Amino acid sequence: FSTASIILYFFTQRKEFFLFAFFAGFSGAGMAILTPDVTYSFPHIDYVRHMIGHSMILLGVTYAMVIDHLRPQFKDVHRVLAAMTLFMLSMYPINYLLGAPANYWFVIEKPPGLNITDYMRDAPYHMIDIFIIAVIVCYLIYIPYLIKDKLQTSRP
């Protein structure tokens, strides 16, 4: 969804698409790069595709931030978390209808490999843990803007 969201932003210039790509992209794509769920390593094409695809999300969001001067506001954290919750809830029936091996947003089972989900409860309860982490990460992603805003308002 982050890929589609940043592409839609570039076509429409609607800030809502940027915001979703910003929070979901930096958290999801960032985690995907740090802990890839591919079973192969470099130079296998699946590994390269995975890394390039997720890097393009981050590059697209960074481009919008630098060139278009976009940034999130505090209220946007809540709006994007609400949208991500709706998407997460819709992913289970979509994965179910698609059948195995569909596991978009990892709602059916945990991703393979060593990653943070190893410390979470078994499926489907791991989604509660993932949701809590997503909330925390979205607020952490916003902290630099919060600090910047506080510093600017405290200057005479």
Residue ranges and their predicted role:
Residues 45-59:
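Membrane-interface loop-to-helix entry segments
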Residues 79-82, 86, 98-138:
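Membrane-interface transmembrane-helix boundary segments in multi-pass integral membrane proteins
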Residues 18-26, 50:
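Cytoplasmic-side transmembrane-helix entry/capping segments in multi-pass membrane proteins
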Residues 25-36, 84-93:
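Aromatic-anchored segments of alpha-helical transmembrane domains
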